[in-house]
Amino acid sequence: MIKKAIAKVVERIDLTEAEMIEVMDQIMSGGATPAQIAAFITALRMKGETVEEITGAARVMRDRATPIRVGKGVLDIDRDDINIDQETILDVVGTGGDGTNTFNISTTVSFVVASCGVKVAKHGNRAVSSACGSADVLESLGVNLDVTPETVEQAIAKIGIGFLFAPALHGAMKHAIGPRKEIGIRTIFNILGPLTNPAGADCQVLGVYREELVEPLARVLHKLGCRRGFVVHGMDGMDEITLTRETRIAEVTRDGVSVRTITPEEFGFASCPAGELRGGDAAGNARIVRGILEGATGPRRDVVLLNAAFGLVAAGKAVDPAEGVRIAAEAIDSGRALAKLEELITLTNE
């Protein structure tokens, strides 16, 4: 199938979702050669990936991931018949690769939101193009990443947050690692990670590195069965909701997708220079994260509150972002958010 797919894509012919599923199955089962994989993902990038192609690829990655079971079973958001007895699971994640070198905003947000009673399955990896990925900062904070899937499940069930370390749960990705490194360009795999949470997160705040990805990835989430979510891109380049400029945001509901532009001032925050949100290496970012959770004020806290607010709306814990900001601020000021970090450190090191 992959030979036929390459021939179509080089002629700028889009694949159907079913065709993409067949190709990705071949890639992730080891049935395609490195040369075929490299040719295919390069041609796909040059053509431009469609919503159907991304959706098909995401379905295969989800199916082949090691599942993280939450509640009574695996919450699979590819299915139409989602078990309504399952608890809401939220992921706050970005594609990375935005080049802005901010501190780990979504990781900090995850602890704030989890301390508000939302089950959080934080999906992430080590840094690829940035100085510090979510796995790097968590490790520096003292979280043990070398844990079993059962420990991750226990963390989500017991304390309300677990870290899903992508390399440990997406073993079938090994077949694409070599070709991806050797061609050295962004491909479909750069955007698939945030779409393939192994815990089947049914609510999501997804940051993307390019404005043009906002609406397409929102439509992918909708096709995959996302109950409520936001796909965001700061117009300063951030794969987060930013304080420096406007943010382009697509809201995903069961009814469809709507896109708009927001400003920090709408939610009571002053804009700030980009330098106020920058981070550093893992140790430096760990100090920033802990400082925010301990109550440090300023633009870094504000950007966490704003992003957490949309996470709380996605998870149904706030009716709107304004209420979400108030709830998130109280979670930090009460010490609950910091306590959530300490609980995860303790549980993963037992």
From Swiss-Prot:
<dbReference type="GO" id="GO:0005829">
    <property type="term" value="C:cytosol"/>
</dbReference>
<feature type="binding site">
    <location>
        <position position="94"/>
    </location>
    <ligand>
        <name>anthranilate 1</name>
    </ligand>
</feature>
<keyword id="KW-0460">Magnesium</keyword>
<dbReference type="InterPro" id="IPR005940">
    <property type="entry name" value="Anthranilate_Pribosyl_Tfrase"/>
</dbReference>
<keyword id="KW-0028">Amino-acid biosynthesis</keyword>
<feature type="binding site">
    <location>
        <position position="240"/>
    </location>
    <ligand>
        <name>Mg(2+) 2</name>
    </ligand>
</feature>
<dbReference type="GO" id="GO:0000287">
    <property type="term" value="F:magnesium ion binding"/>
</dbReference>
<comment type="subunit">
    <text>Homodimer.</text>
</comment>
<protein>
    <recommendedName>
        <fullName>Anthranilate phosphoribosyltransferase</fullName>
        <ecNumber>2.4.2.18</ecNumber>
    </recommendedName>
</protein>
<feature type="binding site">
    <location>
        <position position="240"/>
    </location>
    <ligand>
        <name>Mg(2+) 1</name>
    </ligand>
</feature>
<keyword id="KW-0328">Glycosyltransferase</keyword>
<feature type="binding site">
    <location>
        <position position="125"/>
    </location>
    <ligand>
        <name>anthranilate 1</name>
    </ligand>
</feature>
<dbReference type="Pfam" id="PF00591">
    <property type="entry name" value="Glycos_transf_3"/>
</dbReference>
<feature type="binding site">
    <location>
        <begin position="104"/>
        <end position="107"/>
    </location>
    <ligand>
        <name>5-phospho-alpha-D-ribose 1-diphosphate</name>
    </ligand>
</feature>
<dbReference type="Pfam" id="PF02885">
    <property type="entry name" value="Glycos_trans_3N"/>
</dbReference>
<keyword id="KW-0057">Aromatic amino acid biosynthesis</keyword>
<feature type="binding site">
    <location>
        <position position="134"/>
    </location>
    <ligand>
        <name>5-phospho-alpha-D-ribose 1-diphosphate</name>
    </ligand>
</feature>
<keyword id="KW-0808">Transferase</keyword>
<dbReference type="InterPro" id="IPR000312">
    <property type="entry name" value="Glycosyl_Trfase_fam3"/>
</dbReference>
<feature type="binding site">
    <location>
        <position position="106"/>
    </location>
    <ligand>
        <name>Mg(2+) 1</name>
    </ligand>
</feature>
<feature type="binding site">
    <location>
        <begin position="122"/>
        <end position="130"/>
    </location>
    <ligand>
        <name>5-phospho-alpha-D-ribose 1-diphosphate</name>
    </ligand>
</feature>
<keyword id="KW-0822">Tryptophan biosynthesis</keyword>
<keyword id="KW-0479">Metal-binding</keyword>
<dbReference type="GO" id="GO:0004048">
    <property type="term" value="F:anthranilate phosphoribosyltransferase activity"/>
</dbReference>
<comment type="similarity">
    <text>Belongs to the anthranilate phosphoribosyltransferase family.</text>
</comment>
<dbReference type="InterPro" id="IPR017459">
    <property type="entry name" value="Glycosyl_Trfase_fam3_N_dom"/>
</dbReference>
<dbReference type="InterPro" id="IPR036320">
    <property type="entry name" value="Glycosyl_Trfase_fam3_N_dom_sf"/>
</dbReference>
<dbReference type="InterPro" id="IPR035902">
    <property type="entry name" value="Nuc_phospho_transferase"/>
</dbReference>
<feature type="binding site">
    <location>
        <position position="239"/>
    </location>
    <ligand>
        <name>Mg(2+) 2</name>
    </ligand>
</feature>
<comment type="pathway">
    <text>Amino-acid biosynthesis; L-tryptophan biosynthesis; L-tryptophan from chorismate: step 2/5.</text>
</comment>
<comment type="function">
    <text>Catalyzes the transfer of the phosphoribosyl group of 5-phosphorylribose-1-pyrophosphate (PRPP) to anthranilate to yield N-(5'-phosphoribosyl)-anthranilate (PRA).</text>
</comment>
<feature type="binding site">
    <location>
        <position position="94"/>
    </location>
    <ligand>
        <name>5-phospho-alpha-D-ribose 1-diphosphate</name>
    </ligand>
</feature>
<feature type="binding site">
    <location>
        <position position="180"/>
    </location>
    <ligand>
        <name>anthranilate 2</name>
    </ligand>
</feature>
<feature type="binding site">
    <location>
        <begin position="97"/>
        <end position="98"/>
    </location>
    <ligand>
        <name>5-phospho-alpha-D-ribose 1-diphosphate</name>
    </ligand>
</feature>
<dbReference type="GO" id="GO:0000162">
    <property type="term" value="P:L-tryptophan biosynthetic process"/>
</dbReference>
<feature type="binding site">
    <location>
        <position position="102"/>
    </location>
    <ligand>
        <name>5-phospho-alpha-D-ribose 1-diphosphate</name>
    </ligand>
</feature>
